């Protein structure tokens, strides 16, 4: 089987916003954050499917220890080895000492179909736990390889209306005293840079504006505001891996083997029965859509 050595997508934002847990509850955090995805693909059990484990982490500051950990979760599910499409439900571990969730993974995520086409693909959004179309935008070349860029636009969506989970609601202060319920609202966009031949995602831009809104949908408090792109190092490594896919095997079936987890994913052993949780911007993008506080898009104050 083909062994891929690199399976890490690291995105960094020097001025992100999130919520930080403390003994007194939660408090706003503004500063550097790193969002990282690590993918571990197990040895395939048959000729058609493999099991993937995808760990997501959000780290504050330098991300050097568990105290900097903002969020972590791991998804485990079967995929079609050629298309990359989910072939069954996922087990999601996200909170210490709580049962895992069962989630239907729609569409694709980090692996598009081999011989990708200039069309729209449904791509899984882990915050919404459902797919949102990614629209073909352009063909480009990276390190001599043909790469397609697909753009995914996420309209403001009340996540609490989709499923119940920690963090989907909060308490917001009311004018004149008292509190009211706040609802996590997810919005933003992603751009996926996909190696056309193999379907491997070799780069990603992410501009996320998550906030807590009142019953009328007016943004009141930032939850996770982040703008970053895949690090240069990760992108180069992923392009190299794509280039090493045997051409004849891609035409038949992409034989995914074991992909080593990144060091950060190893930290996630404190969560769930799985024993796992779960740079600089090359494609810098504007923050024009950040900080939807007060019901309109306004620049996030720093």
Regions found by a protein language model. Name each.
Residues 1-115, 229-249, 275-281:
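Extracellular or lumenal secretory-pathway regions
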Residues 167-170, 214, 219, 262, ...:
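Solvent-exposed, non-transmembrane amphipathic alpha-helical segments
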């Amino acid at each position: 089987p083909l062994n891929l050595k690199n399976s890490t997508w690291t995105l960094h934002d020097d001025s992100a916003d999130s919520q930080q847990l403390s003994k007194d509850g939660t408090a706003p955090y503004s500063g550097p954050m790193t969002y990282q995805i690590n993918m571990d693909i197990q040895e395939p059990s048959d000729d058609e499917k493999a099991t993937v484990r995808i760990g997501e982490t959000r780290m504050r500051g330098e991300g050097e220890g568990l105290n900097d950990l903002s969020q972590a979760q791991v998804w485990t599910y079967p995929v079609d080895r050629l298309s990359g499409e989910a072939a069954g439900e996922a087990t999601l571990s996200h909170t210490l000492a709580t049962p895992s969730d069962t989630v239907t993974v729609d569409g694709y995520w980090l692996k598009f179909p081999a011989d990708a086409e200039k069309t729209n693909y449904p791509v899984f959004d882990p915050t919404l736990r459902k797919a949102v179309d990614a629209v073909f935008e352009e063909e480009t070349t990276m390190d001599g390889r043909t790469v397609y860029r697909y753009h995914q636009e996420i309209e403001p969506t009340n996540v609490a209306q989709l499923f119940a989970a920690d963090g989907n609601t909060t308490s917001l202060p009311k004018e004149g005293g008292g509190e009211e319920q706040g609802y996590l609202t997810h919005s933003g966009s992603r751009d996926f840079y996909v190696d056309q031949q193999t379907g491997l995602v070799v780069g990603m831009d992410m501009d996320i504006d998550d906030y807590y809104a009142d019953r009328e949908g007016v943004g009141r408090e930032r939850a996770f505001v982040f703008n970053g792109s895949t690090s240069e190092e990760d992108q180069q490594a992923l392009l190299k891996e794509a280039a090493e896919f045997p051409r004849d095997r891609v035409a038949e079936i992409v034989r995914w083997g074991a992909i080593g987890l990144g060091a950060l994913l190893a930290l996630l052993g404190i969560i769930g029965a799985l024993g796992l949780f779960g740079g600089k911007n090359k494609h810098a993008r504007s923050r024009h859509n950040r900080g939807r506080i007060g019901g309109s898009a306004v620049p996030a104050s720093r």
